[in-house]
């Protein structure tokens, strides 16, 4: 069945181009368009689309307000379009806070110069988020954990929320259908799905994520205490203009410190370094971060596999890695290297993922030592490292 899409934008040119691009995919049908947030709500209620593309700056009602209303009245996956500026990044993070699932930069130049690339990216996003878990899509949604305060009331490190209570997740042995069809030669023992993770003297915590990641990272990191004993590196698929604003937001919300990584930064306990968009991040055995130019041959900039691989080489069995919600399989090969070095790999469970792609790749490859619900990961990190 085709994915039904509602296109919302006050620019007639952009509405037409997005409609043309989406209509060229046989699996997608544009069921309607709207020119402002108010029309978007009316059309969403009338047409019941599978996905909504949403601009931010519109007359009568902006995109963020519209997203909030839509999430309350007819929860629907929303893909936001955002400008490539620091302010655009801030607004996009607010939209994700309101319940949007994902975003794309609104780049008119790319539409003109690279129409095939834009078509592939946009259609891939639409098809993917149409299958997203709406219950897990936003930190502003009804299902959001208490650890995610609203942006208008940013908490200080001293008043960050307490960890969410543990929640049991059915084990793979109890649900055989969820297990991979055929174990491979590198298959570990059945992963843990509840209980306390084994303590180990970890020198680094590495977390990789994509779609749904801004929500998931906030949910996890706000549960960590200021005296968290290990350095952290974060890899979130995100454009260059967005990672600085995202790091700043996390830093305001968390007890630990968070910053966008720069070349030469030194890893230290209680500091999380976020890989800069458009580049690659590696770590060396001296505890120093290396930031490299993004390679155009790679789909992801930053790439989880690259950071995980460097961590495996530099820290051997002393890395605790976590793969959170996201499209595709980035992180799988890096996790394989970590496992070969003796390190630990965790995956987010399907029920709490917005997109069960990256964690599924870890689980299917039999690389996961543990599979945890999003609300439990922060607590387990504390138990494993403190």
Curated annotation (Swiss-Prot):
EC numbers for this chain: 3.1.1.61, 3.5.1.44
Modified residue annotations for 4-aspartylphosphate: 55
Signal peptide: none
Keyword terms, alphabetized: Chemotaxis, Cytoplasm, Hydrolase, Phosphoprotein
Biased composition, class Low complexity, residue ranges: 132-194
Segments forming domain CheB-type methylesterase: 191-383
Maturation and modification: Phosphorylated by CheA. Phosphorylation of the N-terminal regulatory domain activates the methylesterase activity.
Cross-referenced SMART domains: REC (SM00448)
MF GO annotations: phosphorelay response regulator activity; protein-glutamate methylesterase activity; protein-glutamine glutaminase activity
Any Gene Ontology biological process: chemotaxis
Keyword Hydrolase: yes
Active site: 210, 237, 330
Domain Response regulatory: 4-121
Cellular component, GO annotation: cytoplasm
Transmembrane helix in keyword set: no
Subcellular localization, as worded in the UniProt entry: Cytoplasm
InterPro entries tied to this protein: CheB-like, CheB_C, CheY-like_superfamily, Sig_transdc_resp-reg_Me-estase, Sig_transdc_resp-reg_receiver
Reactions performed catalytically: [protein]-L-glutamate 5-O-methyl ester + H2O = L-glutamyl-[protein] + methanol + H(+); L-glutaminyl-[protein] + H2O = L-glutamyl-[protein] + NH4(+)
Region Disordered, annotated ranges: 132-197
UniProt free text on domains: Contains a C-terminal catalytic domain, and an N-terminal region which modulates catalytic activity.
Family that this chain belongs to: Belongs to the CheB family.
Record protein name field: Protein-glutamate methylesterase/protein-glutamine glutaminase 3
Higher taxonomy: Bacteria, Pseudomonadati, Pseudomonadota, Gammaproteobacteria, Pseudomonadales
